[in-house]
Each structure stands twice: as structure tokens, then as C-alpha cells.
Amino acid sequence: MNVLPCSINTLKVLYDISGVEVGQHFYWQIGGFQVHAQVLITSWVVIAILLGSATIAVRNPQTIPTDGQNFFEYVLEFIRDLSKTQIGEEYGPWVPFIGTMFLFIFVSNWSGALLPRKIIQLPHGELAAPTNDINTTVALALPTSVAYFYAGLTKKGLGYFGKYIQPTPILLPINILEDFTKPLSLSFRLFGNILADELVVVVLVSLVPSVVPIPVMFLGLFTSGIQALIFATLAAAYIGESMEGHH
């Protein structure tokens, strides 16, 4: 099996699927490039919410924590436990990365259901979760790939590449392809679930615009949280695996 053409084909697939579109979209023309304005607007809102919440959380910490401080400490403890479980005792430096991924995806997923889209009128289409666009999920998956390569090389040096011939050199092509397909699985899983959830809600609202879609929306909120947890857990597991060796 020729690994290089397969790897190039994998990258080409990632590039091709970046043009996947469902529904009507609003674009900005910047220079010679089309920029997906819906994704950027919602992403900026999500980033503003996260930065604002973080600023409030650390601005005036109390010895006897308030309800808000308790909530943020619980979130931090949850992310630390998740990182420690998947990565091991050397989890500390990776908590900010895993936490950022989890919180951005979690708030992005929920923004698709909770953001009052009609507040901001767009010439075409309407606002949606950033994670229902394949470009966003690929942009989240690729840094994860860089992170586990970096973790492995930092811990083991060039000896990290020895995992590709474990348990036998015959598996070298398969082990290499496994690393190149990880970002594909991460991005497609998140993109597919969030897009499907929003499409189901839109169809139900158009058919029965009253009480029936509400349970589906609550189910979507639950699914959105689960998808953020799955992405963060897998990202941490990949980093832990690269530091510990082939399993």
C-alpha cells in the first residue's frame, strides 16, 4: 500500500468537504474570498460569551464562593477530571486546550438552539450554530491532530514514531492512516450530529409550529452537550495515547 497518495487523498477529502452546504447562506466578499458570515457572527457571539464569563469569574474571587463562582469552579474541576482520566498524571499543561475545545463546542452547539436568531437580520438565511458548518469542525479537529503529535514528540522525541511499527512493521501503513483519519472522524461526527439536529427542528417547526418541536429541541440540547463531551474526551484520549504509546 502506498501511504503518501492515501494521505494526500485524505487531505483532499478534507478540502473538498469544506464546500459542503445545506440551506441558504450569507457570505461576505473580502478581497477575492467568500467568507461565511453566519458562522463568523455566531462564533464571535460565542467567543464574547466565553470571554465575558471568564472575566466575571476571575475578577473578584471570594473566600466563601458565590453561586456563580461555585458554578465556574465546578466546570473547571469537571474539565480537570476529564483531562486527568484520559491523559494521566501529566494532564496539567493540557487542561487549557481541552477546556477551550469543550467550552467552545458546548456553547456553540447550544447557540444553535438558544440564540434568538431573529434579533440579527441577515440578507440571506439565518444564524445557526458554528458547529453545523464543516469548516468549523475541521478547524477544531486539525489542532487536535497537531496537539497529539506535539505531545508525543515532546514526551518521546523521534522515538514517538516507533509506535507506527507496533506490534509489527506490517501494520505501518494502517497505523499511519489511523492518525490521518482521526481528524476526519472528529469533524464529521460533530458536524453530522449538530446539522441533523437543527434540520429536524427546522422541519418540525415548519410542519407543526407549536408544541410538538419543543421536546425535540430539549433532546437537541442534551445531544449538543454530549457531542461536546465526546469531542473533548476523544481529544484528551488521543493526547494521552500519544504520550503513553501504542495500545
Swiss-Prot record:
It is a multi-pass membrane protein. It comes from the Eukaryota. The chain crosses the membrane at residues 38-58, 95-115, 134-154, 199-219, 220-240. It is found in: Plastid, Chloroplast thylakoid membrane. GO terms for molecular function: proton-transporting ATP synthase activity, rotational mechanism. F-type ATPases have 2 components, CF(1) - the catalytic core - and CF(0) - the membrane proton channel. CF(1) has five subunits: alpha(3), beta(3), gamma(1), delta(1), epsilon(1). CF(0) has four main subunits: a, b, b' and c. Belongs to the ATPase A chain family. This is ATP synthase subunit a, chloroplastic. It comes from Chloranthus spicatus. The lineage of its organism: Eukaryota, Viridiplantae, Streptophyta, Embryophyta, Tracheophyta. The gene is atpI.
